[in-house]
């Protein structure tokens, strides 16, 4: 796991510790365990990133002697399989069966978008690295906290550079056909067109396409 991702995960968990303090009545602060759920991906094409997420959380808990805000932590990890349907099932299990106080994850934007209405309904705080723009812009969720950038943010300076420095006027874009890829290209298009450019065509190869030849 990179130092950057490890630092971000530690920041998320530190925020979780603050929530642990706020959610528990003072009388039970020492006695009641803090239930921490993780929605991650351990199977399928996104598994590498999901496994790193779990390793980061486990490392943090080991370093803190399995405590957060003075409370013992009960940790629950759920494999979403990297699908919206799997994410919906697993988040319901964490909330309704395991009774978690806070959820970390999921990894992918399309997973996050699949569960945002449910999270708002059950009012369980969700801390995520997923970059779905809608969660903080078009469909803000008061129970969601992002610990990373949005999908489109990194594309804004790239589009400005292409238009202003490279003087490009017409571009064909290519990105994976899933939520993150669409939001990335949407961010690029907005800034590029604001600077006088034009997108001629958008290409959407399926996720994890091995061959990009015509």
Protein language model regions, located:
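Extracytoplasmic "Venus flytrap"
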Residues: 37-56, 78-84, 107-108, 175-182
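Short beta->alpha junction loops
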Residues: 76-84, 202-210
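N-terminal export signals
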Residues: 7-28
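Signal peptide-proximal N-terminal region
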Residues: 44, 54-75, 194-197
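Conserved N-terminal structural module of periplasmic/extracytoplasmic solute-binding proteins
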Residues: 31-36, 65-74, 84-85, 98
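Extracytoplasmic ligand/sensor domains, especially the bilobed periplasmic-binding protein
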Residues: 100-207
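C-terminal segment of N-terminal export signals and the immediately downstream linker at the start
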Residues: 23-41
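Short, well-structured alpha-helical segments in soluble
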Residues: 84-101, 161, 213-214
